[in-house]
Amino acid sequence: MNNSMTEARNEATMHLDEMSIIQALETMNAEDQKVPQQIHDILPKLAEVIKVTTEQFKQGGRIIYIGAGTSGRLGVLDAAECVPTFNTSTNEVIGLIAGGQRAMTVAVEGAEDSESLAREDLKHIHLNEKDVVIGIAASGSTPYVMGGLKCATEIGAHTVAISCNTNTKISDLAQYPIEVNVGPEVLTGSTRLKSGTAQKLILNMISTITMVGVGKVYDNLMVDVKATNQKLIDRSIRIIQDICDISYNQAQSLYESADQNLKVAVVMHLCDINKSEAVTRLNDNNHIIKKAIQN
């Protein structure tokens, strides 16, 4: 095996094929528990990243995840979830995966080995200096990710690298390198396991806390949720009910009178103003409810 931590053999699982099911489960669970602690150790560095993503997002910049295989799929997943959760557009948080949409379900031969493909993908979305490009690669040496970070640097965009090794190539190419050493995988080289878990937790933090910073959360409530189905409409009404301390029926009526805009409904009620005035207050206060009701 090579000297990459993500390719090293795990001493705890040398006899995985001889373990009982419960032994294998206990071993995997013990290994998985190491991941959050390793992430805890890099929280100060992650905070610096989120300061940048928040500020750039406020200025019209985008968060662009770029990766291959599992890493790419996790970036695409996080970007996709931002649309219903925070009512972002599909052009505000973007996930690029080597090989394109097809690579979400099947391996696209050679895609991750191409630096030029990353450049083409970033050119296609009109990468600019306001954007933040977050390269994700468990090994820290994926050419597709390296090409993306090089391209971003040339354009003047902010760059972040997330890897699960130490002293990685992508770390050398980024302004904000994040290295999480989760140790060897339970199944040697299968970075969909602990490495993938670490990446998912980190992306959860980046997107969630960035969206808190730009005003898409009130307390711990999703006040910018995009209500695209009955479950989310019901959630929106219950959020209004909770914030405004009114009945469900009152919240539903308020929601309808605000043209199903949760934030507008809340400001209308708490400030005792009409829809037009509520919209103006929100526009004047960067769409942050707490600022709108204070001013």
From Swiss-Prot:
Source taxon at top rank: Bacteria
EC number: 4.2.1.126
Keyword Flavoprotein part of the UniProt annotation: no
An MF annotation (GO) of this entry: ether hydrolase activity
Catalytic activity: N-acetyl-D-muramate 6-phosphate + H2O = N-acetyl-D-glucosamine 6-phosphate + (R)-lactate
Keyword terms, alphabetized: Carbohydrate metabolism, Lyase
Major enzyme class: lyase
One Gene Ontology biological process: N-acetylmuramic acid catabolic process
Domain SIS intervals: 53-216
Pathway membership, UniProt: Amino-sugar metabolism; N-acetylmuramate degradation
Pfam name, any one: GKRP_SIS_N
Active site: 81 (proton donor), 112
Keyword Lyase applies: yes
UniProt function note: Specifically catalyzes the cleavage of the D-lactyl ether substituent of MurNAc 6-phosphate, producing GlcNAc 6-phosphate and D-lactate.
Description of how the protein assembles with itself and partners: Homodimer.
Other information: A lyase-type mechanism (elimination/hydration) is suggested for the cleavage of the lactyl ether bond of MurNAc 6-phosphate, with the formation of an alpha,beta-unsaturated aldehyde intermediate with (E)-stereochemistry, followed by the syn addition of water to give product.
Family: Belongs to the GCKR-like family. MurNAc-6-P etherase subfamily.
Protein name: N-acetylmuramic acid 6-phosphate etherase
Organism of provenance: Staphylococcus saprophyticus subsp. saprophyticus (strain ATCC 15305 / DSM 20229 / NCIMB 8711 / NCTC 7292 / S-41)
